């Protein structure tokens, strides 16, 4: 066992003494050492219940003959960080989380890991760090929050964000907004729709890194505790059988995750996180081109929030991710191994129930095209991303004058102030990975646009990114970003922007010579942050089309 390096032999008497100071017995030191990576915190609703899940995991580890060592890493709530400087730290926190998992596992000689993440950046961050260790690992995602209810109608966090815009437009009163605010998030769990956290949980299961039904099993249920306990038992078997990440995370496993993502219409943030996770297996193992290639293989089969009517609880009751895999069976790579010990094909064979009103058959989909689309053109030579499944079909093609803003705050003030007209294309730049720095989510401006009823006539384009809760014609991840001298940096108010989601095009309606002349005159602005973690991050981070990972060179 790897743990022998810290516990075996005469020279390791001091190491054993320190472990005994923690209360571990000689008998416990003989067993496989399993690191239980928790991300409990009292400030993130998706993580406030994770101590209970960790306890269940540890019981499972001991039940199967392992010894559990729990430690923590950080977790940022994107919703609380939204709309202010705090959001600059969200995406960069993914790299810190990866580093902490790698560091703790390597320093203490663990034989395997159980990861307990829940929200947006914590899921990919933990997985990235675990891959670096080369150790067997299993993921127990914290589970979704139930939707809130008021007078027979269901609500979630996005209801509150959009309520702000509706209130600003005079559609609802402040008292009505307060009512929604009070009930929309009723307790523990990741926000109730197919936003980034739940999307990443679904893709983690589709990749084979979680037990079946883990992704959609809700946060505070006994079912989640049982899955956690079984995961603890299962990691000991993975260690004994040396089922390392390379045996599970094949190219085909990543393709399964992307196919599920495209079919469900998941968060656009997956186009950052899946390439970043794959990059830990092999550089450029998965790129935007893979999303583009696979988008032609599956339709959009589930009408889930924010673009649709159903919540994750509906997806779970309809059969969860195994049912989604079953519906996509003809396209899924069924030979892929999972942490359950079964292949994806074997999991598919065990599916007994599918509610086709929620998970639609491929011959009767929600939309004929996949839920995400990669756009390229003179405004985004290296690519941009849109959740087409959450866009009003009237906006699939759109031409309009640019309204240019160099920060999210400026754009939100203009939108809520009534300065944006129907037909406009709002451009928010210098919000990319390096320019922000941190590539903030633009949920406040997109929710304001939707809440004010402009999402059928106003598009938003940014080198920043969007919350998984964003809906409407929101095109993000424009690459190269403005801070890198991409064409988005030279857009001027009134320039016509052409959007064609059907043909995957995003163009600035200027001739090539004009674009070249403007780019030649462009001067890189001073960094917004000059000290601390964000300053270091801005210097090392790669482009959004490369997953916004940190460069080693």
UniProtKB/Swiss-Prot annotation:
| Record EC number | 4.2.1.9
Q: Which GO terms describe its molecular function?
A: 2 iron, 2 sulfur cluster binding; dihydroxy-acid dehydratase activity; hydro-lyase activity; magnesium ion binding
Q: Which GO terms describe its cellular component?
A: cytosol
The pathway to which it is assigned is: Amino-acid biosynthesis; L-isoleucine biosynthesis; L-isoleucine from 2-oxobutanoate: step 3/4; Amino-acid biosynthesis; L-valine biosynthesis; L-valine from pyruvate: step 3/4
Which residues are noted in the entry as [2Fe-2S] cluster-binding? 119, 191
Q: Does the keyword Amino-acid biosynthesis apply?
A: yes
Keyword annotations of the record = 2Fe-2S, Amino-acid biosynthesis, Branched-chain amino acid biosynthesis, Iron, Iron-sulfur, Lyase, Magnesium, Metal-binding
Question: Which residues participate in Mg(2+) binding?
Answer: 78, 120-121, 441
- Please indicate which superkingdom the organism of origin belongs to: Archaea
Q: Which GO terms describe its biological process?
A: isoleucine biosynthetic process; L-valine biosynthetic process
- At what positions is N6-carboxylysine found? 121
Which reaction is recorded as catalysed by this protein?
Answer: (2R)-2,3-dihydroxy-3-methylbutanoate = 3-methyl-2-oxobutanoate + H2O; (2R,3R)-2,3-dihydroxy-3-methylpentanoate = (S)-3-methyl-2-oxopentanoate + H2O
What binding details are noted for the cofactor? Binds 1 [2Fe-2S] cluster per subunit. This cluster acts as a Lewis acid cofactor.
Record-annotated active site: 467 (proton acceptor)
Cofactor or coenzyme needed = [2Fe-2S] cluster; Mg(2+)
Tell me the subunit arrangement: Homodimer.
Which family does this protein fall into?
Belongs to the IlvD/Edd family.
Q: What's its job?
A: Functions in the biosynthesis of branched-chain amino acids. Catalyzes the dehydration of (2R,3R)-2,3-dihydroxy-3-methylpentanoate (2,3-dihydroxy-3-methylvalerate) into 2-oxo-3-methylpentanoate (2-oxo-3-methylvalerate) and of (2R)-2,3-dihydroxy-3-methylbutanoate (2,3-dihydroxyisovalerate) into 2-oxo-3-methylbutanoate (2-oxoisovalerate), the penultimate precursor to L-isoleucine and L-valine, respectively.
Q: Per its UniProt record, what NCBIfam families does this chain match?
A: ilvD, PRK00911.1
The protein in question is named: Dihydroxy-acid dehydratase
Task: Write down the species.
Answer: Methanocaldococcus jannaschii (strain ATCC 43067 / DSM 2661 / JAL-1 / JCM 10045 / NBRC 100440)
């Amino acid at each position: 066992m790897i743990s022998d390096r810290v516990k075996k032999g005469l020279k390791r008497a001091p190491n054993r003494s320190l472990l005994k100071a923690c209360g571990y017995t000689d008998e416990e030191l003989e067993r496989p050492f399993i690191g239980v990576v928790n991300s409990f915190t009292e400030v993130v609703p998706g993580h406030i219940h994770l101590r209970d899940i960790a306890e269940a995991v540890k019981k499972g580890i001991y039940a199967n003959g392992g010894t559990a060592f729990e430690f923590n890493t950080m977790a940022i709530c994107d919703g609380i960080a939204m709309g202010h400087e705090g959001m600059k730290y969200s995406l960069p926190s993914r790299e810190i989380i990866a580093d902490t998992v790698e560091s703790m596992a390597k320093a203490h000689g663990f034989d395997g890991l159980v990861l307990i993440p829940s929200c947006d950046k914590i899921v990919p961050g933990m997985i990235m760090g675990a891959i670096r260790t080369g150790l067997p690992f299993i993921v127990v995602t914290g589970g979704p929050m139930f939707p809130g209810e008021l007078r027979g109608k269901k609500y979630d966090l996005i209801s509150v964000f959009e309520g702000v815009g509706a209130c600003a437009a005079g559609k609802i009163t402040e008292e009505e907004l307060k009512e929604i605010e009070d009930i929309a998030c009723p307790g523990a769990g990741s926000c109730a729709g197919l936003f980034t956290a739940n999307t990443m949980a679904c893709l983690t299961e589709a990749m084979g890194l979680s037990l079946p039904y883990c992704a959609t099993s809700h946060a505070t249920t006994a079912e989640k505790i049982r899955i956690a306990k079984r995961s603890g038992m299962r990691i000991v078997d993975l260690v004994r059988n040396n089922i390392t990440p390379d045996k599970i995370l094949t190219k085909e496993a990543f393709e399964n995750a992307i196919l599920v993502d495209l079919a469900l219409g998941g968060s656009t943030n997956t186009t950052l996180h899946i390439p970043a996770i794959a990059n830990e297996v092999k550089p450029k193992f998965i790129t935007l081109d893979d999303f583009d290639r696979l988008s032609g293989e599956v339709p959009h089969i589930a009408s889930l929030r924010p673009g649709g009517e159903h919540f994750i609880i509906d997806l779970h009751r309809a059969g969860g991710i195994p049912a989604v895999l079953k519906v996509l069976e003809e396209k899924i790579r069924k030979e892929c191994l999972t942490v359950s010990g079964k292949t994806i094909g074997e999991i598919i064979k065990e599916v007994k129930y599918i509610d086709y009103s929620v998970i639609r058959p491929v011959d009767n989909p929600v939309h004929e095209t996949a839920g995400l689309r990669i756009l390229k053109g003179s405004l985004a030579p290296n690519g941009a991303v849109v959740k087409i499944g959450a866009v009003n079909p009237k906006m699939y093609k759109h031409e309009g004058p640019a309204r240019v803003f160099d920060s999210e705050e400026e754009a939100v003030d203009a939108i809520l102030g009534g300065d944006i007209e129907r037909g406009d294309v709002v451009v928010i730049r210098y919000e990319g990975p390096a320019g922000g720095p941190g590539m903030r989510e633009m949920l406040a401006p997109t929710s304001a646009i939707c809440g004010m009823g402009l999402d059928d006539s106003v598009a938003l384009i940014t080198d920043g990114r969007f919350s998984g809760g964003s809906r409407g014609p929101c095109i993000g991840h424009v690459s190269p970003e403005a801070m890198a001298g991409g064409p988005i940096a030279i857009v001027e108010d009134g320039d016509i922007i052409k959007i064609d989601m059907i043909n995957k095009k995003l163009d600035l309606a200027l001739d090539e010579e004009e674009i070249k002349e403007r780019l030649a005159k462009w001067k890189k602005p001073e960094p917004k942050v000059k000290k601390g973690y964000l300053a270091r991050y801005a210097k090392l981070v790669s482009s959004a089309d490369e997953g916004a990972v940190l460069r080693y060179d």
